[in-house]
Amino acid sequence: MVVIDRAPFPRDKVCAGWITPAVAAALELDADDYRRGRTFQPITGFRTGRIGNGEKDVETRYPRPVSFGIRRCEFDHYLLCRSGAEVRPGTALTGLRREGERWIVNDEIEAPIVVGAGGHFCPVARHLGGGGGGEPIVAAQEFEVPLDAAQDCPVRPEVPELYFARDLKGYGWCFRKQGVVNVGYGRFGSERLSAHVAGFLEFLRARGRLPASVTGRLKGHAYLIYGTAPRPLVGDGVLLVGDAAGLAYAQSGEGIRPAVESGLLAAGVLLGARGRYRYEDLAPYRRQIEARFGRRDAKPGLARLIPSRVLEALGASVLGSSWLTRRIVLDRWFLHAHQPALSPALHPSA
């Protein structure tokens, strides 16, 4: 297996950065091994609220860790090294063509199967007919910086903070994990994103949640919400996983768990194909994705059909209730506690 990426490794990745126990289980992650020299921050609660003056926050606590804060530069690199793949960092995909039953990559690599895992702008996704522009994206900006010992940041590492836009079309986060703090904001559509981000940072500072001395260069990211603009998942000798396939969760925008699970499902299908990689041999992957994440019908989400004033009232009711915040916003939308972990065992597909 050969992995090519135009970025060097370890590399930064725009991401709030936490994984649930279900992800750790699916990856068979050895937590004791991973936490040696890496960030692995237990999360036992969340502070949630709405962006605006005079809003009351809700703090939800759990008796045991429900997630673990990680840094993507460490997490991705660890998994890549563990995979045993041949890695060619700093290598962009400049050519991809089909010759018979094989792919020719950059005029030097021959392979019977290509897996597109390059995020929203993955060139393999474009080759399959996805990512051509006009897709309804979620846009996000964030920064992650080390915290000096002298900097007084009131955000507790075990309790990340999530603050939602009044129209529920975006939210921001402030997450302190060991020696760094990660701050960001994501929203449906990219219109006026910079203004929304600036407003969120001003809100955090006015509330005393983020010291004025804690600042960093904002980095941007875009991704598709699952079902809003379905991309082709498979073709002859090719399939897409993660953000390249547009699998991010609709309510939270999380992409880590869908990426991990789609990768495991893809691996199972490839093993089951036994060297036959035509479209019909890889079609079980598409069916398994829909069985796991739901139908890909491209219908607009409910939140985009409801008038803004109704959404504001709904958001106030849900986010103002400790019970609804725990059961709906956190347990269901962010933690997906209702969905069991995907088995790490890769069984050949029927």
Q: Locations of the language-model features?
A:
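Hydrophobic "anchor" residues on beta-strands that sit immediately upstream
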Residues: M1-V2, E108, P112, L239
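Predominantly flavin-linked oxidoreductase catalytic cores and closely associated redox partners
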Residues: C81-A212, T228-P232, G246-L247
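A conserved beta-strand/loop capping segment in the N-terminal third of enzymes
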Residues: W18-Y78
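FAD/FMN-dependent oxidoreductases across multiple families
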Residues: G95, E191-L270, G275
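Short glycine-enriched, charge-decorated loop/helix-capping segments at active-site entrances
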Residues: P63-S67, G130, E254-I256
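Glycine-rich FAD pyrophosphate-binding loop
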Residues: M1-C15
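Short, solvent-exposed loop/turn segments at secondary-structure boundaries
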Residues: K13-A16, G129, G186-F188, Q251-E254
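C-terminal helical "tail/cap" subdomain of flavin- and related membrane-associated enzymes
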Residues: G268-A350
